[in-house]
């Protein structure tokens, strides 16, 4: 699928596979509770384990966040300057209207600003944060190689963005 087809699928409530800076991700619109539930079932992941999120930029991040105390705002600005965009995920208080599948019991979500150009563009075209969990069934290995994506997982999605630049491989994002 091309970028616009994948973005349209996400906007329509779909689940897709797309590249990130490290691995292929299984994702959907982070604001769509039904899509998040479908993704959890497809991945075989317990609903008690919230999904990590990616955003395109600080504006995308701020749209997710609950009001922050001033000291946390300052720390976040320093962190962002030093580590983002990049594979560092941070637990931050997010808006209560987000689905429970992307927030823990304390209202925190794992979020990062992705440096991958296709993932960044996908966030922009969707207009918000994306779920970014590894594109594998829970307990199975994740991959940076499009040829190694699980055919059954692919079949359970609306499609995949398999275009360059490919994921670089290596460790998933650090929390």
Predicted segments with their positions:
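Active-site-adjacent structural elements in enzyme catalytic cores
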Residues: 1-175
């Amino acid at each position: 699928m091309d970028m616009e087809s994948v973005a349209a699928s996400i906007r329509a409530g779909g689940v897709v596979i797309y590249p990130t800076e490290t691995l292929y991700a299984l994702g959907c619109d982070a604001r769509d509770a039904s899509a998040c539930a479908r993704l959890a079932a497809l991945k075989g992941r317990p609903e008690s384990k919230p999904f990590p999120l990616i955003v395109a930029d600080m504006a995308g991040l701020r749209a997710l966040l609950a009001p922050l105390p001033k000291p946390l705002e300052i720390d976040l600005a320093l962190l962002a300057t030093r580590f983002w965009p990049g594979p560092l995920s941070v637990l931050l208080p997010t808006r209560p209207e987000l689905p429970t599948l992307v927030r823990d019991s304390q209202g925190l979500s794992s979020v990062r600003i992705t440096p991958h150009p296709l993932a960044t563009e996908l966030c922009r075209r969707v207009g918000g944060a994306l779920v970014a969990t590894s594109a594998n069934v829970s307990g199975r290995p994740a991959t940076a190689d499009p040829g190694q994506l699980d055919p059954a997982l692919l079949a359970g999605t609306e499609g995949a963005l398999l275009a360059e630049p490919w994921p670089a491989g290596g460790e998933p994002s650090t929390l």
